[in-house]
């Protein structure tokens, strides 16, 4: 499979003197979803913050659609095609749903929200005049993803998108992510602890442990019990 959208090579990230990521390497292709599985404290969020430029790299290289973004500030990475939905559903509680999505259109020539966004997340259409702070957790997560998508990314990073969300909404999010990927041909990278969700969306699964990728498998070859062993304390 060619058409690499995200290439991560030998990534090392440190908090002060303490190294947190030890030589992480992986690729994400167009129209592919990759899951990074792991328990809390194993490096998932550190990896995403490093990919986004929130944390500086100690060494290594990150490419988006062939462009080196390793030394770029976060906003330049966004301009080159990375979108990031951090853990905890970062939305603007006092803005309406529609206004929240429009904040992702700041650099766009038009302020019009593409119709496909509401087609992917019908609940947002129904609630577009409602304040973000009045949505449920699952609705806020869909809003955060919608806002990231209007930046027209090549790579979409989702840090634990199912955290604290009821199972029926998790299914909706999985369905939307699968549609987005096909529709746009983008790479989606999710960090996750819920294996059933990862199996619904990911083509390939990695396990991160102690800041290293220790296991990789294609979805159809996944040994569920093997991965569950990594996820249980």
Q: Whereabouts are the PLM-identified features?
A:
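ABC ATPase NBD coupling module
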Residues: 68-89, 114, 126-129, 221-227
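A short, proline-enriched helix->beta-strand linker immediately N-terminal to the Walker B motif
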Residues: 150-154
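ABC ATPase signature
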Residues: 95, 135, 148-149
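The feature captures the beta-strand-to-loop junction immediately N-terminal to the Walker
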Residues: 37-39
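Helix-to-loop junction immediately C-terminal to a conserved catalytic motif
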Residues: 52
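Helical segment within the ABC ATPase nucleotide-binding domain
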Residues: 171-183
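Conserved ABC transporter NBD signature motif
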Residues: 60-68, 80, 110-114, 119, ...
């Amino acid at each position: 499979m060619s058409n690499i959208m995200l290439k991560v090579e030998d990534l090392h990230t440190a908090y002060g003197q303490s190294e947190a990521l030890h030589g992480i390497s992986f690729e994400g292709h167009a129209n592919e979803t990759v899951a990074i599985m792991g328990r809390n404290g194993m490096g998932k969020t550190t990896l995403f913050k490093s990919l986004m430029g929130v944390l500086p790299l100690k060494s290594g290289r990150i490419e988006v659609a062939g462009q080196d973004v390793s030394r770029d500030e976060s906003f330049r990475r966004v301009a080159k095609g990375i979108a990031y939905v951090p853990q905890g559903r970062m939305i603007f509680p006092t803005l309406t749903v529609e206004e929240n999505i429009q904040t992702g259109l700041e650099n766009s020539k038009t302020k019009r929200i593409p119709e496909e966004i509401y087609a992917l997340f019908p609940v947002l259409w129904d609630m577009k005049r409602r304040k973000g702070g009045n949505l449920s957790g699952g609705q806020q997560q869909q809003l955060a993803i919608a806002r990231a998508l209007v930046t027209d990314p090549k790579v979409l990073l989702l840090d634990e998108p199912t955290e604290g969300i009821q199972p029926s909404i998790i299914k909706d999010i999985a369905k939307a992510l699968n549609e987005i990927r096909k529709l746009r041909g983008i790479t989606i990278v999710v960090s996750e602890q819920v294996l059933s969700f990862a199996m619904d969306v990911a083509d390939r699964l990695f396990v991160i442990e102690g800041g290293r990728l220790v296991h990789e498998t294609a979805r159809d070859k996944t040994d569920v019990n093997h991965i569950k062993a990594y996820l249980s304390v």
